[in-house]
């Protein structure tokens, strides 16, 4: 499921849609209260924030071959990426509910991510399906993410989506090799 440069925002929106469909209105009234938002966003009034905090090349991914296009053209293979997300409660929100409700929301969010572990099923093979994985980060690793943002630690869920295949726009033309024929007897 290769896609052009919008693939990163497409994946973010797909995760957002998944959370909105499965958490609203049962635990959070309005779908708009679950938002793609950086924790540094001062005035945003959302309850649950989805924040993309890192993008890395997926090195273990089986590198694909050049892709044959029409005519004498080949396209360079896609770059496989891993996207890293934090899903967190926005403590600055006016809508902020009590601690018990926050924990119920986070519990439901984990359940949703587990139950929809395959975000995109490309139908080809397991390796190309973008999957959600909960990250086993230590408390120290989590606090580092927040201290970099200069924000007090927030309770959250950390997960990755991978592989996300970012297609190349680089195309190469090749000459078809024509078999050279010559008569051996003429080579004296």
Briefly describe each language-model feature range.
Residues 110-166:
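Acidic-leaning, charged glycine-interspersed low-complexity segments
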Residues 74-78, 111, 175-188:
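Short, cationic low-complexity segments
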Residues 53-92:
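Active-site-adjacent structural patch at catalytic or cofactor/ligand-binding sites
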């Amino acid at each position: 499921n290769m896609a052009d440069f919008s693939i990163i925002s497409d994946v973010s929106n797909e995760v957002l849609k998944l959370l909105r469909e499965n958490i609203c209105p049962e635990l959070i009234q309005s779908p708009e209260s679950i938002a793609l938002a950086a924790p540094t966003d001062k005035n945003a009034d959302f309850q649950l924030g989805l924040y993309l905090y890192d993008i890395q090349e997926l090195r273990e991914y089986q590198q694909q071959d050049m892709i044959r296009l029409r005519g004498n053209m080949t396209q360079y293979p896609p770059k496989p990426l891993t996207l890293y997300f934090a899903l967190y409660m926005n403590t600055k929100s006016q809508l902020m509910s009590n601690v018990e409700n926050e924990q119920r929301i986070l519990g439901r969010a984990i359940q949703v991510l587990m139950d929809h572990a395959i975000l995109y099923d490309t139908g080809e093979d397991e390796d190309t399906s973008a999957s959600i994985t909960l990250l086993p980060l230590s408390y120290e690793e989590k606090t580092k993410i927040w201290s970099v943002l200069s924000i007090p630690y927030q309770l959250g869920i950390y997960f990755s989506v991978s592989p996300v295949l970012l297609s190349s726009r680089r195309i190469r033309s090749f000459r078809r090799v024509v078999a050279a024929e010559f008569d051996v007897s003429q080579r004296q």
